[in-house]
Amino acid sequence: MLEKEIRRPIDPAIAHRIPPGQYLTEKFPVLHYGPTPKADLATWDLKVFGLCAEPFRLDWSAFKALPRFDQTVDIHCVTRWSKLDTQWGGVHIREIIARAKPLPTATHVLVHSDNGYTANLPMSRFDDSDVMLADEFDGAPLEPDHGYPLRLVVPK
């Protein structure tokens, strides 16, 4: 059974961090359709292709060998919840962009997930200072309900 989020008044000291119409949560809501995908790290890979000079594929060990990036950010879901000071670990998206060498004609990025979800972003937003591919949340590996083994994090 789903627990109902108790919505309390927002402390005025942090109210500026909550967009209009959002509510603050301490939980990390699970929002996906259908069964939770199961990833086998022995066969998992990250494919980067399309309008780039250097398409490539990384298996899990190659991804984990990339330089690490950690950040603490507020996240605001389109379903109207906000969670402050979330801690993420993974790889800065600029590591991936530098390897792929996008062509000048690449204006958008289309991201695919194992379960069929897609999201597109303008290249200018994808190449932002806080965008990352995260494999950790709050110092632990991502859980399957939250995107294990890898999740695109776009805080803004």
Which sequence ranges carry the predicted segments?
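Structured, non-membrane catalytic/scaffold regions adjacent to prosthetic-group chemistry
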Residues: M1-K156
